[in-house]
C-alpha cells in the first residue's frame, strides 16, 4: 500500500513546474508528493513556493528546504496536491482523516488546478463508509453533538489519547458515521448552515484530477470529462 501511495505522490509532482505557487497537502499520500518536491528542489533546482495545509506539513516542508508563504500573502495558487479518504464517481470526496480539513479547504479554494492523490481503495460508489469529519468550535460542541445524535448521524468526538483532539485552528472534530451519503451536495449545504460548524470534510465538485495508484499502475481521472 505504501508503494502505491508513493507512486501517486511522485506522479503528481510531475505536474509542478518552475515558478509555481503550490499547495502542499496533508496525509499519508500527500506526504510523498511533498517529499518529491523537496527532492526536485535539491537535485533539479526546482523553483517553487509552497502553501501548507497543516502544522505537520509545514514541519515536513521546512525540513526539506521548500520555500513557504502564507495563504494571506497570495491571491491564487497554481496547483494543489492533496489526498482524499473517499472519492465517488461524481468526483465528490471526503477528506479530513488527518484532521486538517479546514486548512485544506481554505488552500483548495483559490487553487487553479486541484489534484487528489489516492490509492485505488479510496474509490467508492457512494461516500460515507469513511466517517465524515465535521470541524466545530469548542463553545457549544456538546450541544451540537447531541443535535447530530438526535439526527441519527452516530457522532463521535475525534480523540487524541484520552482527550479530545484539538485541530491546528483550535477546534474539535466530530466524526459522523453515516454509512452512505445519498446526496453529498445537499448534506454539505445542510452542514454549512449549521451554527457551530466551522467546516466539514465533504469536498464536492472541487477536484480537477484524481491520480489513482493501483496494482496495474497509475491512472489519471479527469473530473471535467465525467458524465
Curated annotation (Swiss-Prot):
Pfam families: Rib_5-P_isom_A
One GO term (biological process): pentose-phosphate shunt, non-oxidative branch
E.C. no: 5.3.1.6
Listed CDD domains: RPI_A (cd01398)
Any GO molecular function: ribose-5-phosphate isomerase activity
Record keyword Cytoplasm present: no
Record bears the keyword Isomerase: yes
Annotated catalysed reactions: aldehydo-D-ribose 5-phosphate = D-ribulose 5-phosphate
Catalytic residues as annotated in Swiss-Prot or TrEMBL: 104
Binding positions (substrate): 26-29, 82-85, 95-98, 122
Pathway: Carbohydrate degradation; pentose phosphate pathway; D-ribose 5-phosphate from D-ribulose 5-phosphate (non-oxidative stage): step 1/1
Record-linked SUPFAM superfamilies: D-ribose-5-phosphate isomerase (RpiA), lid domain, NagB/RpiA/CoA transferase-like
Keywords: Isomerase
Subunit-structure text: Homodimer.
NCBIfam families for the chain: PRK00702.1 (NF001924), rpiA (TIGR00021)
Recorded family membership: Belongs to the ribose 5-phosphate isomerase family.
Entries under PANTHER family matching the protein: RIBOSE-5-PHOSPHATE ISOMERASE 3, CHLOROPLASTIC-RELATED (PTHR43748:SF3)
Physiological role: Catalyzes the reversible conversion of ribose-5-phosphate to ribulose 5-phosphate.
Protein name, per record: Ribose-5-phosphate isomerase A
Gene it is expressed from: rpiA
